[in-house]
Amino acid sequence: MTSFRPYWDLIQHNADFRRLYLARLVSFAGDWFLVVPLLGLVYEATDSALAASAVLAAQALPAALLVPLTGAVSDRFDRKKILIISDLLRAGLALSLLAVDAVGGVWFPLLIMLLEGAGAAFFYPASTGALPNVVDEQELPVATTLMSSAWGTMAAVGAATGGVFATLVSRDAAFVLNAVSFALSALLVGRVVQNLQAARKPIGGAGRESNRDAFRYIFSHVRALALLSSKGVHSLTSGGAVALFALMSITLLETGDAGTGALFGARGLGNMIGPIVALAIVGRSNRRILGSIGWAMTVWGVAYIFVGFSPTLLLAAAAVCVAHMGGGTQFTFSTYGLQELMPDDVRGRIFALDFGIDMMAISISALILGALAQTVAIRPLLIGLGLVAVVFGLAWTTLTRPLWADLETATDEG
C-alpha cells in the first residue's frame, strides 16, 4: 500500500492538480460512453468492418490534420480557456447525436466524430502541456502517471458501463451522459486557480512558422525523437487492434455491445493499473523509467498474440488487460520523458505533434485493419500485430539503451 501514498498525497494536497485530474476523469468517461454505442450503431447499419473502423479513424484523424494549429494555440493562448471551450463544444456535439435517427445514414455520426476529435485535438496538448505548471518537478512522475491513468480508469469504467448502459437503457441516454461529462469537466477546469503556462515573451511568427521551432527541437534532441517514435509505432499497432474490438465481439464472440464494452473496459483497466505497477517496480530513476519503455511494448505484443488465440470473451478480455498494462506504461513513461525534456515555450506544440502522430497512426491502422478484416480472419490479424510489437519493442530497447545510460533522477536535454 505504501507505493500508492505519493498518488494520494498529491491528489489530497494539490487542489489545482486535483481539479485537472477530475476533469480528465469525467471527460474521458463521456468519451467511452460515446464510442462504444457508435461502433455498434454503425456496424449494425452497414454490416461493414471498415465502416465501424471509420468511427475510430474519424475521432483520431483531426488531431493529425490540425497539428500546425493546435500546438501553437496551446502555447500562444490561455490553456484554461482552451480546455473549457473544447469541453463545451464537445458537449453540444454529443447532444446533436440525439438526431442521428432523424437525419439517417452513417455520414452524420462520422461527421460528429470528426468534430469531436477536433475538440480533443485542442484539449490534449493544452492539458498535457499545463501539467508541469501545476506540480513541482519532483511530483511530475507521479502526476504524469495519474493523469495518464485517468484515461485508463475511465476507459475501463466508461467503456464497460457504456456498452451495458446502451444495451439495457438506450444509446441516446449514453449520448446525453457524454454531454453532461464534458460540461462537468469544463466546470472543474474553470475552478483551477494557478496559471496553466509559464510567463514568457510573445511567440512570433505564423502558426506554421512557429511550429518549425518544435520540429527543430525534436530533430536536435535524439532522446525526444526516440520517445516520439515509440509512441507513434505503438499507436500504429494498438489502433489497429482496438479497431477490431467491435467486430470481434459482434461476429466472433457473439457478445454484442456489452462484449465490445468489456474489451474496451479491459483495455482501460490495463492502462490504469499498468503505469502505477511499473513505476512502483522501476522507481524514480529516469534511466530505469525510460529504459523500460521498449519492454512495455514487448509485453503488449506478447499479450495480443494470446488475444488472437482466445476462444472466449473472458480470456480475450484478460489478455487485453495484460496487453494494455504494457501499453499504458509505454504511453505514460514516454509522456513523462517528453515533459522532462521540453521547455515550456514549445511544450504545447510538441505535445500537439505527439498527439497528431499518434492519432494519424491510429487512423491509418484502424482503416487498414478494417479493410483487411473484410477478407482476412480476425485472429491472424491480431497475432500479426502482436508479433510486430514484439520485434519493434526489442529493437527499440537495444538501440536506445545508450541514450538513457547517464540519466538518474534529472533528465538533461540532449
What are these regions (language model features)?
Residues 1-414:
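Alpha-helical transmembrane-bundle signature of multi-pass membrane transport and export proteins
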